[in-house]
């Protein structure tokens, strides 16, 4: 069975969207998946899929809403897709993994997302500072050399309903999740 990663958007940030990781692991196992492991409490799940890949995100969203009472978007990636995201990082020279983020987009990015990104960057003008962003496939890469919390671009891109609909993870989390997908990783623990 292929290994996948599920990324939940916006959980455990506010009191009304709390999800306990043991409950999330049990839910994913209850959907017929195996080798389920979570990483930190921000909604990162690694598992081997027991059902069709095309329905993973929708099935997880529905089960989380029905069983845990939390409505959230879910982005799923195969191990191969996540490996491609890591390989395609346009900012490999940044030594601090917390200065590079991947925003995993829901759906396909395409020209419309690139156009929205350009519009946001143009609107912010000098407020963008040294920040950079690029879309490759279904991933928006965000480089914030002065810090994510200080980035005007990050604030706009991370806003629900903003130009980058998806869920963000810093590079340390992205690479840890890929390591968890490997045969010698911690899947199943």
Feature locations, PLM:
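Surface-exposed, charge/polar-rich loops and edge strands
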Residues: 2-189
């Amino acid at each position: 069975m292929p290994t996948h990663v599920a990324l939940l958007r916006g959980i455990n940030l506010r009191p009304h969207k709390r999800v306990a990781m043991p409950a999330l692991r049990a839910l994913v196992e209850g959907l017929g998946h195996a080798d389920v492991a979570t990483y930190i409490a921000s909604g990162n799940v690694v598992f081997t899929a027991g059902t069709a890949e095309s329905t993973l995100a929708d099935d997880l969203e529905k089960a989380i809403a029905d069983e845990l009472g939390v409505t959230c978007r879910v982005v799923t990636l195969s191990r191969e897709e996540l490996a491609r995201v890591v390989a395609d990082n346009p900012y490999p020279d940044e030594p601090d993994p917390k200065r590079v983020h991947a925003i995993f987009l829901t759906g396909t990015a395409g020209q419309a997302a690139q156009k929205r990104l350009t519009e946001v960057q143009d609107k912010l003008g000098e407020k963008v500072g040294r920040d950079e962003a690029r879309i490759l496939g279904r991933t928006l890469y965000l480089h914030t050399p002065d810090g994510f919390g200080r980035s005007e671009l990050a604030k706009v891109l991370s806003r629900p309903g903003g130009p980058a609909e998806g869920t963000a993870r810093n590079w340390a989390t992205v690479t840890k999740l890929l390591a968890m997908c490997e045969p010698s990783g911690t899947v199943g623990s």
